[in-house]
Regions:
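Residues that define the transmembrane beta-barrel architecture of outer-membrane proteins
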Residues: 209, 238-242, 273-277, 315-319, ...
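Transmembrane beta-barrel wall of Gram-negative outer-membrane proteins
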Residues: 269-371
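C-terminal outer-membrane beta-barrel translocator/porin domains of Gram-negative envelope proteins
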Residues: 347-497, 501-503
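Outer-membrane beta-barrel "beta-signal"
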Residues: 246, 518-522, 527, 546-558
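Periplasmic polypeptide-binding modules associated with outer-membrane biogenesis and secretion
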Residues: 23-233, 263-276, 413, 435-437
């Protein structure tokens, strides 16, 4: 065997070992490195693109008493009707009156009208009015007249900036029926830009039933620079990782977001290292949102051959185009449907010789349904996603297809649940956060598509260099945090549990991990945020080696 083919053969042998368990710290793992990088990219996006504040405008409905037990005179009501412009569209509100079969006098008729009015307000139609015109109730028919509240004009409050745009943020247009849900969506679209803020006032217009929307929009310097440092990398590609991210907010003045990030290993010299780049752009279109994300990642390591050392390196590229729409929102619930198309490429080399066995190029789509519900002070998020690989965009068959241990067209279902509950005990402010994530697939999956546990982003208490992965699995992360007064610091305790199953798990040394963590996070000087923790394994398979699980992350914004 030639000297250049010897390390290629070695890496191929290691690839086979990896498919059955895990890579050691002394050899590069192409799949493990990419899985870790995908988690880091997700965390980066959460830091740079914080979730826009949820806007829930207060209701203005009156508190109503029940119908009077008896009125004199009163008229037996056998039918309830609605007339007026758009009466057919709003006829559903009549059910709130509960007037049919009752004997109503003046007080009861007025109460029936107010109940219908409250039903409209509860659905966000705060300027649409219901009236009772003079009529004869002897036939037993009560007729309510609807006057729809429409938007007459939309404008920015003075002084208005030339960078302010409402056309793609506000789902409604002049002439539309005014609804608070549209205004809430618009405010979320404005506030998704971290350097901008907005408020919308409803002002009466001259015409009956017409209102003007007046938008107060302001913006600070729309350029952000952030520097970050953490020890969340791996020993194989660099434990300490740093990144610099440039964000340009409202770049095209359509409430859009853009960032470019570049990262690399720090405090590390050959024989190993890594580099990454990320680019993201997204913009709202009323209830829609369009986004594009591009990432590439490179790592290298020098491995020892029989007589000399060889450079082993890996290159990967990820791209995704996403489209989402809020399909339902009310005072307490919001439902979003999303569609994502993705492509992933990865290649690995020894010196300049490509390892064909590790060449991957896959593509596919993912359909998602997400629900956010407000349960008093608590928030419950639920997500269901279905991912399917396809042959589009030049996708290649996976090397594992020859052995039946994976494929380039997987069908994978994932479920995400998150519960957040603030608590106050005396003067102490606490918060409970519980997250559950699961994955299911009937067929065999390649390593990058498998469910992975073990590490700071999954089950804490493990350094992440070794992990358990298989086609199916679940994990449960729990935190109890305590706000340390007004200092902006938070102390937290964590308890995590995870389990994998499926065909690939038959070759693992175990299937379940559990770990605990204690840490502190917060912000200092308004610009510096940090998170530092120490974690320990509670349950692990015999022979599952793991290093120290303490860690930190720092981020400073300018």
């Amino acid at each position: 065997m030639s000297s250049i083919h010897w390390p290629v053969a070695l890496v191929c042998i290691l690839a086979g070992v990896h498919s059955s368990w895990a890579w050691s710290n002394t050899h590069p793992s192409p799949d493990q490195a990419l899985i870790l990088q995908q988690e880091r990219e997700r965390v980066l996006q959460e830091q740079v693109l914080p979730a826009a504040p949820d806007v829930r405008l207060p209701r203005q409905a009156d508190v109503l008493a029940d119908y009077p037990a008896s009125e004199a005179p009163c008229f037996a009501i056998h039918e309830l009707r609605m007339v007026g412009e758009l009466a057919e569209r709003f006829r559903w509100a009549l059910a709130a009156a509960d007037a049919v079969g009752r004997c109503l006098g003046a007080q009861g008729v007025n109460l029936a009208m107010k109940r219908v009015q409250n039903a409209l307000i509860a659905q966000g139609y705060v300027t649409t009015r219901v009236l009772v015109t003079p009529q004869d109730l002897k036939p037993g028919v009560l007729t309510l007249t609807l006057i729809p509240g429409r938007i007459q004009s939309i404008r920015f409050a003075e002084p208005a900036s030339w960078r302010a745009r409402w056309s793609n943020a506000l789902p409604a247009r002049p002439g539309d029926v005014l609804n608070l849900r549209d205004i809430e969506q618009a405010l979320e679209n404005f506030k998704r830009v971290p350097t901008a803020d907005a408020d919308i006032q409803i002002e009466p217009a001259g015409a009956d039933g017409k209102s003007d929307l007046v938008i107060a929009w302001k913006e600070i310097l729309p350029i952000r620079l952030s520097l970050s440092l953490d020890d969340g990398g791996s020993d194989a590609t660099g434990r300490y990782q740093g990144s610099a991210t440039l964000s340009l907010d409202n770049l095209l003045t359509v409430n859009d977001l853009f960032y470019y990030s570049q990262g690399k290993d720090l405090f590390q010299h050959d024989p190993l290292g890594s580099k990454s780049r990320s680019l993201h752009y997204s913009l709202p279109l009323g209830y829609w949102q369009l986004g594009l994300t591009l990432n590439d990642y490179r790592y290298h390591q020098t491995i020892a051959g029989a007589n000399e050392k060889y450079l082993y390196r890996g290159d990967s590229e990820n791209s995704q185009l996403s489209l989402s729409r809020v399909v339902f929102r009310s005072q307490a619930h919001k439902t979003t449907l999303s569609l994502r198309a993705y492509q992933r490429k990865s290649r690995n080399f020894v010196e300049d010789t490509e390892i064909r066995l590790q060449h991957r190029q896959i593509a596919g789509w993912e359909l998602g349904l997400n629900q956010r519900s407000y349960l008093g002070d608590a928030t419950l998020d639920a997500g269901l996603n279905w991912r399917r690989g396809t042959a589009m965009l030049g996708a290649l068959p996976a090397p594992e297809e020859e052995t039946g241990s994976g494929g380039s067209r997987p069908s994978v279902a994932t479920v995400d649940l998150s519960y957040n509950q603030p608590l106050q005990i005396g003067a102490q402010k606490l918060r409970i956060n519980s997250q559950w994530r699961g994955q299911w697939s009937k067929g065999a999956l390649v390593p990058q598509d498998r469910f992975v546990i073990g590490g700071r982003y999954t089950v804490r208490g493990f350094d992440g260099d070794l992990s358990l992965s298989s086609e199916r699995g679940w994990l449960w992360r729990n935190e109890l945090s305590w706000a340390m007064g007004p200092s902006g610091q938070e102390l937290y305790l964590g308890l995590d549990l995870g389990r994998v199953s499926g065909a690939a798990s038959a070759l693992l040394i175990g299937r379940q991990l559990a770990g605990g963590a204690v840490g502190m996070r917060g912000s200092l000087f308004k610009r510096l945020s940090y998170d530092m923790f120490t974690a320990w394994p509670i349950q692990k398979p015999a022979g599952f080696q793991t290093g120290a699980a303490s860690g930190f992350s720092l981020n400073i914004q300018f």
